[in-house]
Amino acid sequence: MRDQLWPGEADRLWHRRTEQGFSTIPRTLPLVMTLIDDLKGKGKDTSRVYLDLWCRQMDDSFVEVTDEDAFAYSCGYSTPGRNVRTWRERIDILRDMGFIGVRPNGSRRYGYILLYHPHKVVAEVQKSGKVSLEWWGAFAKRATEVGAVLEPPSAA
């Protein structure tokens, strides 16, 4: 179908099997990011930090924080002096929500990050009653479309 609608465009497209620099991410990630934004405080653009972490992991859910300035800039935090502080605040929010684990590396407080299975985290958040029925419906539909198996939701 694609080639019928865009003939001759194949050489302009990203092909994960022939390119370097790709990452495997859950197909439900946009909805998980929406939930993160729904649950965090106003003005705390946390979901793009979560996306950046997923793009940095190498299919092992593990990220070594090698340069906090570069991580912050990648997430859109470019103001010197505030960029790293803002990034760290968002990391703390993701940790407190249960989406990631954080461990130090020597004297560096944010040395390593572990990305937990987002569907398992979502199930825990849903059990706490913080997930809207609208979001859960959209998430369950998308998860079913991509073949993901979800824990049954708590009775509301």
Model-predicted segments: where are they?
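Short recognition helix of helix-turn-helix/winged-helix DNA-binding domains
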Residues: M1-D69
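Short, cationic/aromatic linear interface patches
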Residues: R12-L13, R103-P104, G111-E124
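Short, amphipathic alpha-helical interaction segments positioned at domain boundaries
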Residues: P118-A156
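Intrinsic-disorder-associated interaction segments
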Residues: T18-T28, P80, V125-S132
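Winged helix-turn-helix DNA-binding recognition segment
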Residues: R56-I113
